[in-house]
């Protein structure tokens, strides 16, 4: 028992019978961030909420910089989404956190959330502890970010779809467990192609390849679409392979916390 995490000991005591833990039907936020590689400023934040009618994108641009309040438009491209434009990075961040408070999702999912998106938010948000419903977020390692199976946000789960298969977490792990063999790599585009999905936006209308360093400046509308599509494609992938149901079912079957599901073996 000394080797069993305390949280798991509590859960096993509360729910001693197999499958006695209540079923978990989480509200999930699939999200993606873009930021300026030179200044580190967040530029676009896309959210696909499983309880919402359509995705929402928070953004600001050189053109919107300094504007008062928010400008909201419904964009018909890429299946339709709501775009909320702000006058600065800080105002966009505040609106994102307000929306997080309002929606109160159970799980945040992003491709490389552990070493990219979440550490970036910790760096850039004025109040990063607002990511937690109880105001407590463990800070990442300065250089390496979080472990791929970490749960640093108290009261809210994260799942990193880009985690290595060897961690027992992420899409690659589930891909292997389902008998599909090994993925060529863990890139979102590769996984989308394996599932016959359209995948990411990779070029403009003239065939010029995406340049994440410049598109915020030169192709703003397309850059916002690019961030949005990364989010909606990730949701499609996860729903096609039952990503979230797999881990919530393992959690209930074994009667443990989500952080322990990656340790479960056949």
Per-region residue spans from a language model:
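Conserved RNase H-like, two-metal-ion catalytic cores of nucleic-acid enzymes
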Residues: 3-9, 13-107, 128
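Short, flexible loop/turn elements at secondary-structure junctions
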Residues: 33-37, 51, 64, 114-117, ...
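Short helix/loop capping segments that flank catalytic or ligand/cofactor-binding pockets
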Residues: 38-40, 118-119, 167-169, 186-191, ...
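Conserved DEDDh/DEDDy metal-dependent 3′-5′ exonuclease domain
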Residues: 71-184
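Generic, well-ordered alpha-helical scaffold segments in large soluble proteins
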Residues: 99, 103, 111-112, 120-124, ...
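C-terminal or mid-to-C-terminal helical accessory/interaction module adjacent to the motor/catalytic core
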Residues: 177-178, 182-222, 227
């Amino acid at each position: 028992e000394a080797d069993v995490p305390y949280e798991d000991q509590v859960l096993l005591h509360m729910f001693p019978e197999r499958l006695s833990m209540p079923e978990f039907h989480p509200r999930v936020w699939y999200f993606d961030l873009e930021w300026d590689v030179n200044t580190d400023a967040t530029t676009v934040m896309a959210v696909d909420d499983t309880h919402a009618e359509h995705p929402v994108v928070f953004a600001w641009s050189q053109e919107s910089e300094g504007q008062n309040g928010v400008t909201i438009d419904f964009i018909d491209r890429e299946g339709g989404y709501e775009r909320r434009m702000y006058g600065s990075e800080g105002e966009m961040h505040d609106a994102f956190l307000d929306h997080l408070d309002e929606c109160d999702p159970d799980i945040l999912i992003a491709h490389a959330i552990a070493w990219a998106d979440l550490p970036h938010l910790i760096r850039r948000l004025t109040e990063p502890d607002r990511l937690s419903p109880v105001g407590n977020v463990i800070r990442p390692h300065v250089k390496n970010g979080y472990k791929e199976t970490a749960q640093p946000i108290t009261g809210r789960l994260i799942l990193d779809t880009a985690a290595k298969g060897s961690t027992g977490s992420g899409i690659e792990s589930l891909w292997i467990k389902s008998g599909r063999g090994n993925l060529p790599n863990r890139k979102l585009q590769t996984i989308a192609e394996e599932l016959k999905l359209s995948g990411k936006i990779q070029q403009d209308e003239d065939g010029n390849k995406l340049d994440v360093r410049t598109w915020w400046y030169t192709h703003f509308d397309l850059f916002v679409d690019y961030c949005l599509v990364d989010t909606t494609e990730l949701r499609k992938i996860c729903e096609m392979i039952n990503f979230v149901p797999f881990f919530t079912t393992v959690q209930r079957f074994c009667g443990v916390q989500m952080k322990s599901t990656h340790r479960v073996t056949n």
